[in-house]
Amino acid sequence: MRNSVQSDLKYINIINISETLYLFYSTGLDTLEYIDSTYKNFIIMYVNQHLLYGTTLKYLSVGEFFINSLTIFINGIRETMTSSTVIMYAIFGMFIFSEIMVFSTFIWGFFHFRLSNPVMIIEVNLEAFLQISDVLNAGSILISLILQRIEERGYFEVDYMLERLILIGFIFLSFQGDEYSLVKSYINNHWVTLYFNVLTGLHSLHVYVGGIFALMQAFASENCGCQKDEDFNAGMYWHFVEIIWIALTMLLFLL
């Protein structure tokens, strides 16, 4: 086994040296420096530390090698495309992705417990549910109009719509607070009330954050003019909140 490992390592070293010499003589010193900083150093680390190549896990080690090479390639492309706009979209995208993961965790927990208890009677206040949904739907329609005005460069109406969006957000939070005050059970009475309060509480928190975003954009629109990218990001955040509410509606009120 040890002799097989050593022979494989020597074979990898021979390939590495041959490729390095060929690129050195054909392209010059810059290519050699690039190889020394990326590919060659990784090969040396792989040979010295990753001895799985000579065992039954040979293909696993080779797969890991190609995954690391692909990662280096992707990072090289990402570094060439780095700009302030790309960084902003990356941060905003990762924030949305993290929020999706948080909600998915609690939604899956509720879905799991609900399927484990198929026979269960839950009293649903449809009037309060419809009021909250109508308010949030009005906010979603208003966001769509804001994004349309931004695309049409109708910036004079954006400030007015953002102020109305802030008002809609506070109305939604008021209705949600009334619903909490009328609930007759506490958060630790049953798993249904636990998930109901946690999920709707997280959603209300995101509506509050969306209202802060709208307030900041309204202030910036009054002082600095309309900022297309920032308004678009705030609008997409509100659409994300609307999608989450649709998922909560199916789980908490219709399932």
UniProtKB/Swiss-Prot annotation:
Q: Name one GO molecular function term.
A: cytochrome-c oxidase activity
Question: Main localisation, per the record?
Answer: mitochondrion
Gene name for this UniProt entry: MT-CO3
Q: Which InterPro entries match?
A: Cyt_c/ubiquinol_Oxase_su3, Cyt_c_oxidase-like_su3, Cyt_c_oxidase_su3-like_sf, Cyt_c_oxidase_su3_a-hlx
Q: What class of enzyme is it?
A: translocase
Q: Which domain of life is it from?
A: Eukaryota
Question: What stretches pass through the bilayer?
Answer: 12-29, 57-77, 91-111, 126-146, 155-175, 196-216, 235-255
How does the record say this protein sits in the membrane?
Multi-pass membrane protein
Q: Which species does this protein come from? A: Theileria annulata
Q: How does it assemble?
A: Component of the cytochrome c oxidase (complex IV, CIV), a multisubunit enzyme composed of a catalytic core of 3 subunits and several supernumerary subunits. The complex exists as a monomer or a dimer and forms supercomplexes (SCs) in the inner mitochondrial membrane with ubiquinol-cytochrome c oxidoreductase (cytochrome b-c1 complex, complex III, CIII).
Record function comment: Component of the cytochrome c oxidase, the last enzyme in the mitochondrial electron transport chain which drives oxidative phosphorylation. The respiratory chain contains 3 multisubunit complexes succinate dehydrogenase (complex II, CII), ubiquinol-cytochrome c oxidoreductase (cytochrome b-c1 complex, complex III, CIII) and cytochrome c oxidase (complex IV, CIV), that cooperate to transfer electrons derived from NADH and succinate to molecular oxygen, creating an electrochemical gradient over the inner membrane that drives transmembrane transport and the ATP synthase.
Q: Which UniProt keywords apply?
A: Membrane, Mitochondrion, Mitochondrion inner membrane, Translocase, Transmembrane, Transmembrane helix
Q: What is this protein called?
A: Cytochrome c oxidase subunit 3
Cysteine pairings via disulfide bonds: none
Instruction: Quickly give the catalysed reaction.
Output: 4 Fe(II)-[cytochrome c] + O2 + 8 H(+)(in) = 4 Fe(III)-[cytochrome c] + 2 H2O + 4 H(+)(out)
> Biological process GO terms, please?
mitochondrial electron transport, cytochrome c to oxygen
